[in-house]
Amino acid sequence: HAPNALVLTVAKGETARTATPLRAVTLTCAPTPGGTHPAPEAACAELRAVDGRFSALRGDQDRACIKIYDPLVVTAEGVWEGQRVRYERTFGNSCTLQTEAGPVFSF
C-alpha cells in the first residue's frame, strides 16, 4: 500500500492563512483506516471514491442550507497514495460544508 497520512483542519474565516483554527484531526487510510478522525472508515471510503481528489467530494446534496454567511475554511495536507497533497476550500457556513464536503470534514 502507498502511504496515506493527512492532517485535516476546519477554521473560522475566509482563508487558512487568516482564519482561527477550530478543529484538527489526523486521518490515515492505509493499511487500515485510523487516526484521530471520528469516522475514519467513512472518510477514507469517500476519499477513495473520488481517487483522493478533495475538490470532487460530495456530501449530502439533498440537504437545504440557509444563506447566512459565516465562512469556514477547510484544509488537508499530507500524503495520499504516495503523493503530496495540499487542499484549501472556503464554505459559506457549516451547513454548506457538510452538504458539499461530507464525512471527510465532519469532525
UniProtKB/Swiss-Prot annotation:
Gene Ontology MF terms: serine-type endopeptidase inhibitor activity
Keyword check for Secreted: yes
Major location category of this protein: secreted
Subcellular location: Secreted
Cysteine pairings via disulfide bonds: C29-C44, C65-C95
Gene Ontology CC annotation, any one: extracellular region
Alphabetized UniProt keyword annotations: Disulfide bond, Protease inhibitor, Secreted, Serine protease inhibitor
Family annotation (Gene3D superfamilies): Subtilisin inhibitor-like (3.30.350.10)
Keyword presence, tRNA processing: no
InterPro entries assigned to the protein according to its UniProt record, in alphabetical order: Prot_inh_I16_SSI (IPR000691), Prot_inh_SSI_I16_CS (IPR020054), Subtilisin_inhibitor (IPR023549), Subtilisin_inhibitor-like_sf (IPR036819)
Quaternary structure and partners: Homodimer.
Family: Belongs to the protease inhibitor I16 (SSI) family.
General function of this protein: Strong inhibitory activity toward subtilisin BPN' and, to a lesser extent, toward trypsin.
UniProt-recorded name of the protein: Subtilisin inhibitor-like protein 5
Species this protein is from: Streptomyces fradiae (Streptomyces roseoflavus)
